[in-house]
Amino acid sequence: MKNTHIEHPEDSILTGDLTVLDAFLMVCLLSVKIDGAPAIVWGTNPATGNFFVGTKSVFNKKKIRICETQEQIIEWYGGTPLEEILSCCLCNLPHTDRIFQGDFIGFGGESEYTPNTITYQFPSVVQEEIIMAPHTEYVAKSDLRDAVAYPLCKYNPFPASAATNPDGSYFVKWVQPKAYIWDGAYGEYGKDSFAELRDLINFAKVRATGVEFVSPKEAAQYKKELNACIREGETVNPYDWENSDLIKFWLLIKSIKADALSLCRYAHGPNAYIGQDRIDSEGYVMHTESGSWKLGNRELFSHANFANSKFVCASA
């Protein structure tokens, strides 16, 4: 898939695209959303054959910033927090002939990190130089602008030997929890789909026949207004909307997502908090052959993001 925005299931149906309903019943892979910042891309630049680091600007069509040297980092990011982050990434991330993207969590030396809104608590002080949560791999034949994204769901795909100092100490602490669909028993494997939601999904398909869906342009406006309601803590009341049947259907899909989310679990990850409150995670991403969708509690994180002084404008 191209490097496109991943949507919530309920937002994806506004135009009448019901792909997500069948996707819930497909074999899927789950990954845990990590609330890190900034997003870092690294790997081998197919255009030059050189190792690089950068932000998502490496994919820009025009203002491209692919940092292959320390001098380029200083030129483009000198005097900003990104200078230190990218410099450490250039020095510490293992060289690879592949291309990855991950969320930067912080520098070693602490046991608690709050890169954005969520605080992550590790069981002991992090000894590695940097902490990275990889989530995406890209394939690009000749130019990063043509990169195609694939979810990185394999637990810890990076060999320890690829990120160690000569004395055996580590450069990078990888954070990639193992996510799974709970089957009601103890263990880390669970089910491979949300098949137990089949009756609800079939009901939703029947309900869809009576809904007047909207154009992509209209859907964008609906999303904007729905996000505003969620951020401001307002209840989404279908009867406040001209197309009340569409909003009722949106709420139905949102409830199916909540049921799916209640079945998601993960292991091998740090504890997560918002303030003093322990939470499961920021959420999950469901990956299927039909696409990927976000599974998360929008109300919880929109409020937290909106209240976070690091954000000028939050998006659900």
Language-model regions, residue ranges each:
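Core nucleotide-handling region used for phosphoryl-transfer chemistry
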Residues: M1-C28, K33-P38, W42-A316
